[in-house]
A protein has these predicted regions:
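Long, K/E/R/D-enriched contiguous segments that form extended
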Residues: 33-139
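Acidic/histidine-rich catalytic neighborhood
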Residues: 183-211
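Extended, charge-enriched "interface" segments that sit outside catalytic cores
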Residues: 1-42, 46
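Active-site proximal loops enriched in glycine and acidic residues that flank catalytic Cys/His/Asp
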Residues: 53, 60, 91-94, 130-132, ...
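Conserved small/polar residues in nucleotide/adenosyl-binding loops
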Residues: 224-230
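A donor-sugar binding/catalytic signature common to diverse glycosyltransferases
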Residues: 147-192
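C-terminal (or distal) subdomains of carbohydrate-active enzymes
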Residues: 207-222
Length: 231
C-alpha cells in the first residue's frame, strides 16, 4: 500500500489515467471471455463489474446480495430504477461439503441468474453470474477486472483476510462493513473512497439484546417487501 501511494502523484496525469482505464478494460474483457466459455453467459465488458467472491457462508451474506438483485430486478421491470451504467453482478465461491444452507444459497443465486439473464428486458441493464469452481487461479482473472468489491460480512464475524486488499490494489472500490481487514482498508483509502455498509458489531449486539423484529426493516420503498415473506 505504501508503494501504491506514489500513484497519487499521477492523479492529474491524463495519459496515465487513460492507460489505467485501458488496463482495467482489458482485464474485464479477459474475464468476460472466461465467463462466456464457462457459463455461456454474454456480459458487456464496459458494464460495471460488481463482485462478491469468497467462501459461501451465511455470515458472509451472499444471500443478502442476492435479495438485493431481486429488488433491483423488480425496480427495473417496473421502470422505477435505471442504473447509470449496465451492471454485471458476479459471485464465486465454494460451500463446505456438509453445509446445506450454503449449497442452497448457491442454488438460489443460480436461480436468480436464470431469470434475469433470460429476460430480454434486462438486456443492456443487468446480468448475474455464478462462477463455478472458484479458486486462487481464477482469482487472478477476477481481481483485475473488478469495479466494485462486495465485502458485506456481518460485523464481528470475519477474520482478517486479504481478499478486500487484493481487490483494492487492483483498482476496485469497496462496499463493506466495519469487519475484518475492511477496518484497516478504510483507514488506508480514506472514508470518502469506501462505501460503508450495514451496522457495526456493537449495533448488531444491541439489536440482538433488544429482541428486534426483522419485519421492522422491511421497507416498501426499497422493494424488500417483495423479496421477503412478511407472514
Amino acid at each position: 500500500m505504501d508503494l501504491l501511494k506514489k500513484l497519487e502523484e499521477k492523479k492529474d496525469d491524463n495519459n496515465f489515467l487513460q492507460k489505467f482505464e485501458e488496463t482495467k478494460l482489458n482485464g474485464k474483457r479477459k474475464l468476460s471471455s472466461f465467463i462466456h466459455s464457462k457459463t455461456g453467459i454474454l456480459v458487456d465488458p464496459s458494464s460495471l463489474f460488481d463482485v462478491q467472491v469468497k467462501r459461501i457462508h451465511q455470515y458472509k451474506r451472499q444471500h443478502l446480495n442476492a435479495l438485493q438483485i431481486i429488488a433491483q430486478y423488480l425496480r427495473l421491470k417496473n421502470g422505477t430504477n435505471k442504473y447509470e451504467v449496465p451492471r454485471t453482478i458476479i459471485f464465486g465461491g465454494k460451500a463446505a461439503p456438509g453445509y446445506f444452507m450454503a449449497k442452497l444459497m448457491i442454488r438460489f443465486i443460480n436461480g436468480i441468474a436464470d431469470v434475469v439473464n433470460s429476460d430480454p428486458d434486462m438486456d443492456g441493464l443487468l446480468r448475474v453470474v455464478f462462477l463455478p469452481d472458484y479458486n486462487v487461479k481464477l482469482g487472478e482473472i477476477v481481481y483485475p477486472a473488478t469495479d466494485l468489491s462486495e465485502q458485506i460480512s456481518t460485523a464481528g464475524k470475519e477474520a482478517s483476510g486479504t481478499g478486500d486488499m487484493k481487490f483494492a490494489m487492483n483498482g476496485a472500490l469497496t462496499i463493506g462493513t466495519l469487519d475484518g481487514a475492511n477496518v484497516e482498508l478504510r483507514d488506508l483509502v480514506k472514508k470518502e473512497n469506501f462505501f460503508l455498509f450495514g451496522k457495526t458489531e456493537s449495533e448488531i449486539m444491541d439489536l440482538k439484546n433488544n429482541n428486534y423484529s426483522p419485519k421492522t426493516f422491511i421497507d416498501p420503498v426499497s422493494y424488500t417487501h417483495l423479496t421477503l415473506p412478511t407472514k
